[in-house]
Curated annotation (Swiss-Prot):
Main subcellular location: cytoplasm
Regulation acting on activity, per entry: Feedback inhibited by histidine.
Catalytic activity: 1-(5-phospho-beta-D-ribosyl)-ATP + diphosphate = 5-phospho-alpha-D-ribose 1-diphosphate + ATP
Protein name from the UniProt record: ATP phosphoribosyltransferase
A GO-annotated cellular component: cytoplasm
Keywords annotated in UniProt: Amino-acid biosynthesis, ATP-binding, Cytoplasm, Glycosyltransferase, Histidine biosynthesis, Magnesium, Metal-binding, Nucleotide-binding, Transferase
Family membership: Belongs to the ATP phosphoribosyltransferase family. Long subfamily.
HAMAP family named in the record: HisG_Long
Location(s) in or outside the cell: Cytoplasm
An example Gene Ontology molecular-function term: magnesium ion binding
Pathway named in the protein's UniProt entry: Amino-acid biosynthesis; L-histidine biosynthesis; L-histidine from 5-phospho-alpha-D-ribose 1-diphosphate: step 1/9
Job of this protein: Catalyzes the condensation of ATP and 5-phosphoribose 1-diphosphate to form N'-(5'-phosphoribosyl)-ATP (PR-ATP). Has a crucial role in the pathway because the rate of histidine biosynthesis seems to be controlled primarily by regulation of HisG enzymatic activity.
Length: 283
């Protein structure tokens, strides 16, 4: 069976669980369960600490896992990113107290930086020629400055609310942009059929989240103009209607552009424009 690691807690956990459920995999019922076997789909799910997933995958104890790109980079393991998963977007930033004179990357020189991601931060500072002390903390790094342990912090920022509440402000360019991703062990062949099935299923969920099915009627004389607005993946489905002057068109379109596309189609001459959500797909 394919061994898959998922976060047991944290901001990536629920979206990861939901994505696997939408892909047809069985999840745990009891929150105390650490391992779930799904023989019908040929997988075992392991619920692990987010910080540890890349380590297990990198050492080959687990075949694939869902984690953050920042966690993968910080792990320093041999685990390989296989595909982005479209959720958990964040940036990794430096932050200093509002009243601090630290406002640029150069100001970090000689300072103390508290972070949970010490390898990521150390490597970034070395790359930019900055010498600073990196202080490892397992969480709640925002308190380190107030307690006098550090001069600034480096941490994951989603909305920035936690930093603002702690009297901190971000500065300098992000160390990196991150999102959830599927990672694989270097021992697992990229062409492994089990991985191929998982990849197709997850990509199908992503497509269903990002696209909708659009149906509309269009005069035959305006079909070319309408297809230019909604070309679809390969080509839209065009069918004749009872009225021989009209065709029906069915096409997948990006969910984020639905209203603009409906307006554009209406201007072209389309009528009866209907949008339907997708539950799953294989492209």
């Amino acid at each position: 069976m394919l061994r898959i690691a998922v976060p047991n807690k944290g901001m990536l956990s629920e979206p990861a669980w939901n994505m696997l459920a939408e892909a047809g995999y069985r999840l745990r019922i009891n929150p105390r369960q650490l391992v779930v076997q799904d023989p019908d789909n040929g997988i075992e799910l392991f619920y692990l600490r987010p910080l540890d997933i890349a380590v297990y995958v990198g050492r080959g104890a687990i075949d694939v896992g869902i984690t953050g790109q920042d966690l993968l980079k910080n792990s320093g393991t041999a685990a390989l990113e296989h595909m982005p998963l479209g959720f958990g977007a964040s940036t990794f930033r430096f932050a200093a107290p509002n009243e601090s004179p630290i406002t640029t990357l150069e100001d970090v020189q000689g300072k103390r930086v508290a972070t949970t991601f010490d390898k990521l931060v150390h490597d970034y500072l070395v790359e930019h020629g900055i010498q600073a002390e990196t202080i490892h903390l397992d969480g709640a790094v925002e308190s380190s400055v107030q307690l006098g342990v550090a001069d600034l912090i480096a941490d994951v920022v989603s909305t920035g609310t936690t930093l603002r509440n702690a009297g901190l402000r971000v500065f300098a360019e992000p160390l990196m942009h991150s999102e959830a991703c599927l990672i694989r062990s270097p021992r697992l062949n990229e062409q492994d059929p089990r991985l191929a099935v998982l990849t197709r299923r997850l990509q199908g969920v992503l497509t269903a989240h990002q696209y909708v099915l659009m149906d509309y009627d269009i005069p035959i004389s305006k079909v070319a103009a309408a297809v230019a607005v909604t070309p679809g993946f390969e080509s839209p489905t065009i069918s004749p209607l009872h009225d021989k002057q009209w065709n029906a068109v069915r096409v997948m379109v990006p969910k984020a552009k639905v209203n603009q596309l409906m307006d554009d189609l209406y201007e072209v001459g389309a009528r009866g424009i209907i949008v339907t959500a997708l539950q799953a797909s294989r492209m």
